[in-house]
Swiss-Prot record:
One of its GO terms (cellular component) is nucleolus. Interacts with NOC2. Forms a nucleolar complex with NOC2 that binds to 90S and 66S pre-ribosomes. The modification Phosphotyrosine is found at residue 708. It comes from Saccharomyces cerevisiae (strain ATCC 204508 / S288c) (Baker's yeast). Residues 28-37 have a biased composition (Basic residues). InterPro entries: ARM-type_fold (IPR016024), CCAAT-binding_factor (IPR005612), CEBPZ/Mak21-like (IPR040155). Residues 73-93, 117-127, 898-920, 928-951, 971-987 have a biased composition (Acidic residues). PANTHER family: CCAAT-BINDING FACTOR-RELATED, CCAAT_ENHANCER-BINDING PROTEIN ZETA. The modification Phosphoserine is found at residues 62, 73, 80, 275, 710, 874, 878, 977-978, 1024. The modification N-acetylserine is found at residue 2. It is found in: Nucleus, Nucleolus. This is Ribosome biogenesis protein MAK21. Residues 128-143, 186-197, 718-729 have a biased composition (Basic and acidic residues).
Length: 1025
């Protein structure tokens, strides 16, 4: 079988069946002896016994069927197996069977294999030779669509005729010209195998002997004329000569295509089936059929390529997308070589002495290059389709081709980069993501991709949307130390965009701009809003144009600053370039977004240190930023603290400036309630004191030190000399005279309400920093505080953000050690507070922020234990108590004189009905009644109040303990003693209640069963009236 991957029909299975039958027929003498033995053995077998009869009946046979086979022997059964086998004796051959077999083979097309009477020895030799020369066919599996499977199923029966015609027609040698190559060795081997074997060995319809260009190899792997490599030194051909060669190659390819088509369609059923699919089939069937034809031999199916490209130009988006998908698969899977295609005139070694096969291949490559460009034009048109799904699919096709094939990479890159400016953010973000993936797949293309993105970002008519997505694509580019040229290009691009947008958004640059007072149609339409029952204009806080513009600019500036900060360490740019753009960066520090200002300050610090510029202006801006009210609510507090710490460490020689920063830090923190930020600033001061220990002098300075003047100053009393004093309103911290003042602001934090702040402040004053840990700003936020009351484990979140190698710092990184503070709020080692065993912990091991939970849960557990004990003691009579309360309340309602002591009737009632009871029982009964009346109304509230007192009494004790300055351990011991006393009191109360219940039961038993008629006399009189 041929090695072509795209054969239209695969008849190997059918050929194997027929050849096996014929081979068995040719080897009849070899099996003669064995068959004779089998016949003798079958003649000696018995007839159908009773077991076989029962089995036949069980399988559905009837008695009549058994009668039909009663007279048959086993020899008769064996005859059915001898259709293609040898007979028992050659002299006893069935002439009728032989004639039928020959007629069948003649109809099928195997008339050349007539059965002839030959000698046994000759037959044995032929059978052995056929076994030796038999070569198993190689079957290759390749992906086919639904139409391919249906084609094989429908034409499996008709393909037998194709095989017969292939055997009938003798192979004629092609009359090639002098410039044609001889036949390939593979074709000769196949021809010899057909002659030697005498069986069907060719399973393909097309005969490669009639084709000039073989179809069973990729067109770019076919060997060319050897003269191609020898024509490098030949003079260039003229335009007329190239055109002649082009026409010769075109004619050769067209002739070979025609031969291929005739070979493929010489079977009328095959041609009819294919034409029916291409005319009446569905679009999916047509595309699948054409794709299979192209896969067989793209060089011999140029018409199929034209048909598939024509499907891409249909108005239906679905058909266009399906056709483009099929074309993309063809381009990526064997149709294109792993190099750029060449035009015919650009082929190396082009001369007038080349053979037709080489010219045809050169022509096909030229044709394929032009066809690929036509497909790109279709992609460009569909990339502007109004449907987002279509644009996304086209974008995927463009980058698939760009990533896997070098052909037309410049135009493909231009198409992909242009989609960054798409009006829909989904398409823009998808284009940005695919560009970053392209840079990872082809690192050598990084510079080319960046150039294309920069070109679209710096267009004069580029809008904000295009520029923003271009910048966020550039700032995600991964750089290396060796790529300083790429980093320099990025830094220059960022600074250019800075200047462009600062000029456009500068408020002082609005010269001669007059706003039009004319309202648009939409504004006029909105004025006539709906009125009526469900009408009314919704009140929305609409942002002004300046607010929207500022918000957009802050996002763009933030992206630009991120890119500069990432590219700055890799860039090699002289300091003069940075000095030109420093004014731009200082303008950004005064923008409306504080986070953008922080990023600008980070960049200015890097530029100042690396270029060794004057840092006075930077420290003035940083000193001023401490008074910015937006710092309290900023999400970049961690970055700001790290920047402040790094800057003050770098300025260790200017002690006066550092001391001014220390004073202002404490002044600002005294007005804040954010505990996390305050602890962060104190940790900054603790670490800064290790580098600049002179700041501790502020703790010992007093105003008295500067009240006394020197003797030299006393002598100059006539001169008006001002004494230097601290002035916190100075713009420049160098001239604030902080060294002339003392750090009295520290008193507010030593006596702070929060224990953590107090701990850090005391550590700074005393210098005992061994137990002071690096603070986490996220632990003191409101969200973290509320999360502590959620009694469940925290959700496991992925620390990695995206697939980029550039990730934010996390707690396990090595770089984390160089960071002053963090704001992660990651508490992997802590579970819910209700799951911890607080009773087993010591008071000394409790953290300051966990004292509340320690007291709460320890008290609650002790209260729950007491409640369980009291419930066990009172469970046996709880139901009786409920029943007695209901009975007693019913009696009180029916006999009000039972509880009314002042009424005379009650006295009579008591004397008559309680004559057996003593006088001491009456006050006891009244006391019981009063107690029941109180217990009925406030039974539940007393239980709740008692529970609350049990749970929360320790907080009152905590307040008393703090007033009396007792330690926590002493208060816990006193609480245990008070709890024991309460237990004794509760036991006494329970025993007293039980005694009262017994008295009540005795009183109820002494009451009469029936009431007297005198008590209801008034009601009886009313009924009689």
């Amino acid at each position: 079988m041929s090695e072509n991957n795209g054969n239209p029909l695969d008849l190997s299975s059918l050929r194997n069946k027929i050849s096996s039958k014929l081979r068995d027929n040719n080897s009849k003498k070899a099996k003669k002896t064995h068959k004779g033995k089998d016949v003798k053995a079958s003649s000696n077998s018995k007839k159908v016994n009773e077991d076989i009869r029962r089995e036949a009946l069980a399988l559905g046979a009837s008695e009549e069927d058994l009668k039909l086979i009663q007279g048959l022997s086993d020899d008769d059964d064996a005859k059915s197996e001898q259709e293609f086998d040898a007979v028992a004796d050659e002299d006893a051959d069935d002439k009728g069977f032989k004639n039928d077999l020959q007629n069948f083979m003649k109809n099928v097309g195997f008339d050349q294999h007539k059965l002839e009477d030959v000698d046994d020895d000759d037959i044995e030799e032929e059978s052995t030779s056929s076994k030796e020369s038999k070569i198993p066919a190689q079957e290759k599996e390749h992906a086919q669509s639904n139409i391919a499977s249906s084609t094989i199923e429908k034409t499996s029966q008709e393909s037998i005729d194709n095989g017969s015609e292939q055997e009938e027609n003798t192979v004629e040698e092609a009359n090639l010209s002098s410039d044609q190559e001889p036949e390939s060795e593979s074709a000769e081997k196949e021809k010899k195998e057909e002659k030697d074997g005498g069986l069907i060995t060719q399973t393909t319809i097309i005969s490669s002997d009639k084709l000039i260009i073989p179809y069973d190899k990729p067109w770019y792997e076919i060997p060319l004329d050897p003269q191609v490599g020898q024509n490098d030194d030949v003079e260039e051909l003229s335009k007329e000569q190239i055109e002649k060669l082009f026409e010769r190659g075109k004619q050769t390819l067209e002739a070979d295509n025609q031969t291929y088509y005739e070979e493929f369609t010489k079977d009328s059923s095959q041609a009819k089936f294919m034409s029916q699919i291409l005319s009446d089939g569905t679009l999916n069937d047509k595309i699948s059929a054409v794709t299979l034809l192209i896969q067989d031999s793209p060089l011999h199916n140029t018409k199929s390529l034209e048909t598939l490209v024509s499907y891409c130009g249909k108005k239906s988006r679905n058909s266009a997308l399906q056709s483009l998908n099929a074309l993309k698969d063809l381009f990526l899977n064997g149709l294109l070589p792993n190099r750029k295609l060449r035009y015919f005139k650009n082929q190396p070694g082009l001369s007038m002495m080349l053979n037709k096969k080489t010219l045809a291949i050169f022509y096909f490559e030229d044709y394929l290059k032009k066809l690929f460009f036509r497909v790109l034009e279709v992609l460009e048109v569909l990339s502007h389709d109004p449907i987002i799904h279509v644009r996304l699919q086209i974008l995927n096709h463009v980058f698939d081709l760009l990533t896997n094939q070098p052909e037309q990479e410049f135009n493909l890159l231009r198409l992909g980069v242009n989609k960054i400016g798409d009006i829909d953010s989904k398409v823009s973000s998808k284009a940005s993501y695919l560009l970053l993936k392209l840079e990872q797949a082809h690192p050598n293309m990084k510079s080319i991709v960046i150039d294309a993105i920069v070109d679209i970002a710096l267009r004069p008519n580029a809008d904000y949307h295009t520029t923003y997505y271009s910048v966020i694509t550039l700032n995600q580019t991964i750089l290396k130390r060796s790529e300083d040229s790429v980093a320099n290009k990025l830094v220059k691009t960022y600074f250019t965009l800075f200047e462009k947008f600062l000029i456009n958004t500068d408020k002082d640059n609005t010269n001669g701009v007059v706003k039009s007072n004319s309202k648009s149609y939409e504004e006029k339409r909105k004025k006539n809003f709906k009125k009526g029952k469900h009408g009314g204009k919704s009140v929305k806080i609409e942002k002004t144009e300046n607010e929207v513009l500022d918000e957009k600019n802050s996002k763009l500036f933030s992206a630009l600053l991120t890119g500069i900060n990432r590219a700055f360490p890799f860039a090699q740019i002289p300091a003069s370039v940075y000095e030109v753009h420093m004014e731009t960066l200082f303008k950004i520090t005064h923008s409306s977004n504080f986070n953008t200002s922080i990023q600008a300050l980070v960049l200015i610090n890097q530029v100042t240190v690396k270029a060794k510029l004057n840092s006075d202006r930077y420290y003035r801006t940083l000193y001023e930023s401490l008074f910015d009210p937006r710092l309290v609510n900023s999400s970049k507090q961690g970055i700001y603290l790290n920047l402040l710490y790094k800057s003050l460490k770098q300025d260790a020689l200017n002690v006066e400036r550092v001391e001014a920063f220390v004073k202002r830090i404490l002044q600002v923190c005294s007005h804040w309630l954010n505990v996390g930020t305050i602890t962060g600033f104190f940790f900054l001061l603790i670490q800064l004191a290790k580098t600049v220990p002179q700041i501790k002098n502020l703790l010992t300075n007093t105003p008295v030190d500067y009240e006394y003047e020197s003797d030299a100053e006393e002598e100059q009393g006539d001169k008006d000399i001002k004494r230097k004093e601290y002035d916190g309103r100075k713009r420049d911290p160098k001239f604030a005279n902080a060294e002339k003042s003392s750090l009295w602001e520290i008193n507010n934090f030593i006596n702070h309400f929060h224990p953590t702040v107090k701990t850090y402040a005391n550590a700074y004053v005393t210098g005992e920093t061994e137990q002071i840990a690096k603070p986490d700003l996220g632990l003191f936020t409101l969200s973290h505080f509320l999360d502590r009351f959620v009694y469940r484990s925290a959700k496991q979140t992925n620390t990695a953000r995206g697939t980029s190698i550039m990730q934010p710092l996390f707690s396990g990184s090595r770089v984390n050690d160089s960071v002053l503070v963090k704001a992660s709020d990651i508490m992997h080692d802590q579970g819910p507070v209700n799951t911890e065993d607080w009773l087993t912990k010591k008071v000394e091991d409790i953290k300051p922020e966990d004292k509340f939970f320690y007291q709460y849960f320890t008290t609650k557990k002790t209260a729950d234990g007491k409640g369980k004990k009291s419930n066990k003691a009172s469970n046996f009579d709880s139901d009786d108590e409920m029943d007695e309360n209901e009975i007693w309340s019913a009696l009180v309602k029916s006999r009000p004189d039972v509880e009314d002591d002042s009424d005379d009737s009650e006295l009579d009632f008591a004397e008559d009905d309680f004559s057996d009871s003593t006088s001491d029982d009456e006050p006891k009964l009244d006391a019981i009644d009063d107690e029941d009346a109180k217990s009925e109304g406030s039974q539940e509230s007393d239980q709740e109040e008692g529970l609350d007192e049990d749970i929360f009494y320790s907080f009152d004790g905590e307040q008393d303990n703090s007033d009396k300055k007792r330690s926590f351990a002493e208060s816990s011991e006193e609480d245990e003693s008070s709890e024991e006393e309460k237990e004794e009191e509760e036991n006494k109360e329970v025993s007293a209640k039980r005694a009262k219940k017994k008295q009540r039961k005795n009183m109820l038993k002494s009451l009469p069963v029936f009431a007297s008629a005198d008590d209801y006399a008034q009601y009886l009189d009313q009924d009689s009236d």
